[in-house]
């Protein structure tokens, strides 16, 4: 039967739709797995994507490990077997320059709220030739040319897929956010994030009770770093650094249950940096992490 291929790195939003489609179409959902650093090997790409593959959907950057996936190799292999290649760019678009033509992906999606825009707005890029073949998935006002009592003809792209009243304020805000990010420039964004990540990883690595997930190379963490403190639940860690240091850590499974299970971690702490963060922010974070165990009576 037909197969859909994703990776173990995926956010639930790039797992659940494919589980649903696999059940509806009686297809098989397959996973590409990663090594200890979160890297998908070329062997895994060549083995999992086969002539049975119809869809390959892959994250650009893991929202847990921060690792970038080998998109070009995956997309090339998908096209070799006649499959559609879809990229989840939610964690990639804010942190790295992306050229969808250069990638040659068939679809690319990202959300606004990871790149300085409000929640409830995002972007879906699709190749025109594919979008023209697709029927509208949602029907309503503004996506038609004509309507009769029994039938309708649909508007051309992109209106065909934009039924109902759009999130106008969200779209205006997303445009402003994208323009601002482009003004700052991705070369600066990447340099600043690397500087901050280098300090964070070097300092955390000095602490014997810290486990860092993903690559030991700070350059391979695109804006996010997941870690755990021995014997202390991430929810306690995040609450303590918030209360004592006004630091916002994400604690939990990061909407990536399969990956956390694969990493043998129930949950993790995740710190994320962006270009507006400073070295002082990182050192303040490190100082709070050093105090967490003493807050709970360890090492006293």
Description of each model-found segment:
Residues 1-300:
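Pyridoxal 5′-phosphate
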């Amino acid at each position: 039967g037909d197969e859909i291929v994703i990776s173990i790195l995926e956010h639930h939003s790039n797992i659940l739709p494919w589980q649903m489609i696999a059940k509806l179409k009686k297809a098989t959902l397959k996973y590409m797995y990663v090594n200890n650093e979160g890297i998908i090997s070329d062997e895994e790409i060549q083995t999992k994507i086969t002539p049975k593959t119809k869809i390959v959907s892959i994250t650009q950057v893991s929202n847990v490990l921060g690792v970038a996936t080998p998109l070009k190799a995956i997309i090339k292999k998908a096209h070799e077997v006649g499959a559609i290649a879809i990229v989840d760019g939610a964690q990639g678009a804010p942190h790295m320059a992306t050229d969808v033509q250069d990638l040659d992906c068939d679809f690319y999606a990202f959300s606004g709220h990871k790149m300085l825009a409000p929640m409830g707005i995002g972007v879906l890029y699709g190749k025109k030739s594919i979008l023209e073949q697709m029927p509208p998935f949602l029907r309503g006002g503004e996506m038609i040319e004509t309507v009769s009592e029994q039938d309708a003809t649909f508007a051309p792209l992109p209106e065909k897929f934009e039924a109902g009243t759009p999130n106008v304020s969200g779209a205006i805000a997303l445009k402003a956010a994208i323009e601002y990010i482009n003004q700052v420039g991705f070369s600066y964004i990447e340099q600043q994030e690397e500087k901050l990540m280098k300090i964070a990883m070097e300092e955390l690595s000095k602490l014997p009770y810290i486990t860092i997930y993903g690559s030991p190379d700070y350059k391979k963490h695109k804006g996010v770093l997941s870690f755990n403190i021995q014997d202390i639940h991430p929810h306690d860690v995040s609450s303590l650094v918030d209360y004592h240091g006004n630091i916002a850590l994400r604690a939990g499974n990061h909407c990536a249950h399969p990956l956390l299970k694969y990493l043998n971690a129930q949950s993790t702490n995740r710190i994320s940096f962006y270009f507006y963060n400073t070295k002082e922010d990182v050192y303040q974070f490190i100082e709070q992490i050093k105090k967490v165990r003493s807050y709970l009576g360890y090492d006293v």
